[in-house]
Amino acid sequence: MNIQALLSEKVRQAMIAAGAPADCEPQVRQSAKVQFGDYQANGMMAVAKKLGMAPRQLAEQVLTHLDLNGIASKVEIAGPGFINIFLDPAFLAEHVQQALASDRLGVSTPEKQTIVVDYSAPNVAKEMHVGHLRSTIIGDAAVRTLEFLGHKVIRANHVGDWGTQFGMLIAWLEKQQQENAGEMELADLEGFYRDAKKHYDEDEEFAERARNYVVKLQSGDEYFREMWRKLVDITMTQNQITYDRLNVTLTRDDVMGESLYNPMLPGIVADLKAKGLAVESEGATVVFLDEFKNKEGEPMGVIIQKKDGGYLYTTTDIACAKYRYETLHADRVLYYIDSRQHQHLMQAWAIVRKAGYVPESVPLEHHMFGMMLGKDGKPFKTRAGGTVKLADLLDEALERARRLVAEKNPDMPADELEKLANAVGIGAVKYADLSKNRTTDYIFDWDNMLAFEGNTAPYMQYAYTRVLSVFRKAEINEEQLAAAPVIIREDREAQLAARLLQFEETLTVVAREGTPHVMCAYLYDLAGLFSGFYEHCPILSAENEEVRNSRLKLAQLTAKTLKLGLDTLGIETVERM
């Protein structure tokens, strides 16, 4: 049930009846303060200006045409022409009942789309580090939300599995007579990579051999392809352990690395030349874009093939977008890549549009994010100044959560404690990131993320168990409760019910904008409203059974909404804490 969409349509029709144009925007929003009702229509200002009348006068005319019978108990004009809408308690009660009767909590399904989501994208032959965390968990929250809404989601893990580094690695493995790469662990590969790079930079003979191996690999030589596959396999096996620990839905089947697009690149360059978009410039093949200017104010040249015949990331990204539209039949493509790549992506997509590879009707969206910073406001590093490995970060999260949980539950059995520590520790790391607006940098702080107060995973997980504890004490007859009516008389009951029914609106925003922090803010607010409701509206000691059952049903929908909301974020809930 999307109340905002329902009210928007009702207000829009009333505005048209009052003389507004058919494309008028009612701007119905959730009210910021209870005295302004549950919703507020703010669109009268802009429309009244076009019609040459006072906003309040337009609002008065709109009210004469606005039929919210059975939806609102009161509608009033405030200030210069805002329309405040107070939802009818009977309407709230009816829709709480409907939400409880539905596995989807009354959430409707929009028109189904095929949506490709590009996220995580670690490099082969390197361990995942904290720089991969944001893309991986923000992208996964978007995927979970879109799938819940009923879309066909194609996860695309665009791993770095191609390029000159593979010539180096294979040459170094061979030099060390360790061709049997399958028995190596990734930590070894990282060491190999460093050694190979050192030799590549210092030993011209070795560098030449590495370059030859790249050519052989790219030409499809079976021995080199097999060595390359081993390197990819070791990496992806290790990464899968990290994905599983993070409770992320990516699998090996979702890998669509750079190598997938490599065979397409010569054809792309030839086609761009044939279309007159790409030209030769100083030996390289370049596309000049009017939308981007260089320092001299001239159209910027984007290289798609180097002098030596090599291709660039831009060429791969052009092929990638083309493939996602033509082969995967995407209706929409989302990229969870950090903000530093924005211009690069915009240039690749400008070429894609000019070439007609992806029509304008298919959005290509860069859902960029900021950096993860330490308490000092600088990029998050180890004490020695190195890159923090993701596995090490998760180990520390688990260890800290273990201590925290053991302190609060000294008698808890070891296996139960481990399970709880895992849910709290991993949940804390993920939620701390997801609860921040992805477009900004955020400070990584263990103390804040593991706190039981504020907008944190431990607080949200505890809030969920607190609601469940009501049911443990209540000794409920499920059938009797299901048949009982919901009755809303108190203000706090109405406020909680209205917020519960805004779950679909929240999901819709997350799906449209790729902003999981909006879901975190909603769930945190919901937990706070339940806390106030629980304090002021006795449940188990209510004045009669009818009120008791009605309040139990509000508690029941709160628990289900918290669980489902946290699930769309990939945060595990627990029964006890």
From Swiss-Prot:
Subunit structure: Monomer.
Protein name: Arginine--tRNA ligase
Entry keywords, A to Z: Aminoacyl-tRNA synthetase, ATP-binding, Cytoplasm, Ligase, Nucleotide-binding, Protein biosynthesis
Pfam families: Arg_tRNA_synt_N, DALR_1, tRNA-synt_1d
Localization terms from the record: Cytoplasm
Keyword Aminoacyl-tRNA synthetase appears in the UniProt entry: yes
InterPro entries the record matches: aa-tRNA-synth_I_CS, Arg-tRNA-ligase, Arg-tRNA-synth_N, Arg-tRNA-synth_N_sf, ArgRS_core, DALR_anticod-bd, Rossmann-like_a/b/a_fold, tRNAsynth_Ia_anticodon-bd
Organism whose genome encodes this protein: Shigella boydii serotype 18 (strain CDC 3083-94 / BS512)
Chain positions of motif 'HIGH' region: 122-132
Top-level taxonomic group: Bacteria
SMART domains reported in the protein's UniProt record: Arg_tRNA_synt_N, DALR_1
Similarity annotation: Belongs to the class-I aminoacyl-tRNA synthetase family.
Annotated catalysed reactions: tRNA(Arg) + L-arginine + ATP = L-arginyl-tRNA(Arg) + AMP + diphosphate
EC number from the UniProt entry: 6.1.1.19
MF annotations from Gene Ontology: arginine-tRNA ligase activity; ATP binding
UniProt xrefs under HAMAP family: Arg_tRNA_synth (MF_00123)
NCBIfam families: argS (TIGR00456)
SUPFAM superfamilies the UniProt entry points to: Anticodon-binding domain of a subclass of class I aminoacyl-tRNA synthetases, Arginyl-tRNA synthetase (ArgRS), N-terminal 'additional' domain, Nucleotidylyl transferase
GO CC annotation terms, alphabetical: cytoplasm
Signal peptide range in chain numbering: none
UniProt record, GO biological process: arginyl-tRNA aminoacylation
